[in-house]
Amino acid sequence: MKGFDPKFKDFPDYIISITKEIWEGREISSLHKYYDKDIIVRSPSSVVVGNQQVIDATISTLAEFPDRTLYGEDVIWCGDPEKGMLSSHRIHSTVTHTKKGIYGAPTGRKLNYRIIADCHAKNNKVDDEWLIRDQGAILKQLDLDPKEFARELISKEGGPENCVKPYTYENEIKGPYIGTGNDNDWGQLYSDILTRIMSADFSVIPKEYDRAVNLEYAGGISDISYKGADNFWMGLRSSFPSAEFKICHQIGRLDEKMPPRAAVRWILNGKHDGWGTFGEPTGASVFILGASHSEFGPHGLRREYCLFD
């Protein structure tokens, strides 16, 4: 890979290896080597600019969860070393809640949750990122109410006027990566499926999904088959019936020894104006940054992962 350290055999190896080196190897200072000093990191809760803030956040997380592991389940990617590459990295993380921190007093509980990180890299450095951590899964396992947790966090940060602002179109910062993925058929198929679902065509689920599809969804939800997919997507869409659904990025891949896969990053922007997963409509403005991965087999979409915060 031109411009990258020769110790990495390919781009997925680069992404998985530096993640392990930084977090499990405790080489947090290597972020200076692998992350651009002006990196932009967008997550549902904030937009962060600068590598020093990334380093500070990494130290804070490891202080609360010293035994954190990050298992790279998949890296779905596009691009080339000369122009830059974009990876969608799905991680299964395990931790033990042994130290006091953002989640309160230590409980000793062992937690499992997923992250999807879309990273743009060129010349051995990551310079643009979209990061989604399944906070709902963490809170559920700690018996914390997500709504109360969010309210308390806002209060600690000085109230609605002074707290860290969540990511929206208003505080978007244009970074080095302006691509929208690749034109692989599998990425296009998955984008079409999600677009049809968000256009209220839920009949696409039994048409395109394998009856035995395995489902891993935001909030630590594990489910199976058509009903599980229908419950999740119906509950989300019915909560925000008038919200605009936008595909921001799509990648499809067909690699040796791997099934066809796709990664899609999307935004749902509008009002909480319907009954669904989030209860009684409040009319609140809502901006959801989501990431979805899928795997296809002989009978259709057979594995689906979808995260938002």
Regions found by a protein language model. Name each.
Residues M1-D309:
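C-terminal and inter-domain tail/linker signature
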